[in-house]
Swiss-Prot record:
GO cellular component: cytosol
Organism: Listeria welshimeri serovar 6b (strain ATCC 35897 / DSM 20650 / CCUG 15529 / CIP 8149 / NCTC 11857 / SLCC 5334 / V8)
EC category: lyase
Record-annotated active site: E116
Involved pathway(s): Carbohydrate degradation; L-rhamnose degradation; glycerone phosphate from L-rhamnose: step 3/3
Name the record gives this protein: Rhamnulose-1-phosphate aldolase
GO BP: pentose catabolic process; rhamnose catabolic process
Keyword Lyase applies: yes
Sample GO molecular function, one term: metal ion binding
Segments passing through the bilayer: none
Biological function: Catalyzes the reversible cleavage of L-rhamnulose-1-phosphate to dihydroxyacetone phosphate (DHAP) and L-lactaldehyde.
EC number: 4.1.2.19
């Protein structure tokens, strides 16, 4: 076996947690990440049939039976991941019946996987049903989009349209729009179920007054989605409350033209023309 610290997926996780912390989106122990690992990725680094311990999940994860995930730990600080991955991360395997998980590696000084494990696994189930190339769920406390949930209507169509109007690239990056979940108690199966339901048709779920969850085929993909939403929200928060108001923005007609140029289909019900007829 090779050193797991040299595994590309481990190096990428360490880099990503540093990026999130440096952006100010992972204060204290805030934020969590999970990545589905392919057998070909992990076979040279870890014996996936050797378990350190097993714990019940408390929900049915049978669609993920036998799958292995690299997951951030509960109560762990993203800023510490790079200097001590084995204490702050873990690798888990969903049991054959989907009722529990096995710890394969990590959490060397004790602990459990992220308290949002239910949200992560439920969202993985949904996204894999929509996209077999899906791999990553990322949750972080992005500042501007969290602030936006206090002052903007939480209607998903209105929220998405505002973001699309802030930066030209937004419609191209997330034509499937942004889903919004109202404030719910963190770390619960209920929040996981609500988030997963939203991920049937959107890769981005905003948790009102809390943060954002993004799904992607790679770490860069998931991070890029969150990064783009956050930048659009930051622009909105900087301009929306000027006494003059917003004097001009990208129009629906211009967004339709943009979608046609980049061959994307805007989520229905948001724009007044073409792919998003109201």
């Amino acid at each position: 076996m090779y050193s797991i610290y040299e595994a590309p997926f481990m190096k990428e996780m360490c880099e990503m947690t540093q990026n999130l912390w440096r952006n100010g989106w992972a204060e204290k122990n805030g934020g969590n990440i999970s990545q589905l690992l392919e057998a070909s990725e992990i076979k040279h680094y870890l014996d996936t049939d050797r378990y350190l311990w097993t714990e019940p999940l408390g929900f049915d994860a049978s669609p993920l039976a036998g799958n292995v995930f690299l997951v951030s730990g509960s109560g762990k600080y993203f800023k510490n991941v790079q200097k001590n991955p084995a204490d702050n991360l873990c690798i888990i395997k969903v049991s054959s019946d989907g009722a529990s998980y096995h710890l394969l590696w990590g959490l060397e000084n004790g602990g459990r996987p992220t308290s949002e494990l239910a949200s992560h696994l439920k969202c993985h189930i949904v996204r894999l049903s929509q996209d077999p190339d899906h791999r990553v769920i990322l949750h972080t406390h992005a500042t501007a989009v969290s602030a936006m949930t206090f002052v903007h209507d939480l209607d998903e169509a209105k929220f998405t349209r505002t973001l699309w109007q802030m930066i030209t690239e937004c419609l191209v990056v997330f034509p499937d729009g942004v889903a919004v979940v109202p404030w719910m108690v963190a770390g619960t199966n209920e929040l996981g179920e609500a988030s997963a339901a939203k991920m049937n048709d959107s890769r981005i779920v905003v948790w009102a007054h809390h943060g954002i969850m993004g799904a992607g085929t790679t770490m860069d993909d998931a991070f890029g989605l969150v990064e783009t939403v956050e930048k659009a929200a930051k622009i909105y928060m900087q301009i929306a409350h000027f006494p003059t108001g917003i004097k001009q923005a990208i129009t629906d007609e211009e967004l339709v033209a943009l979608a046609e140029r980049f061959n994307v289909v805007p989520k229905a019900g948001i724009l007044k023309e073409a792919g998003g007829v109201k």
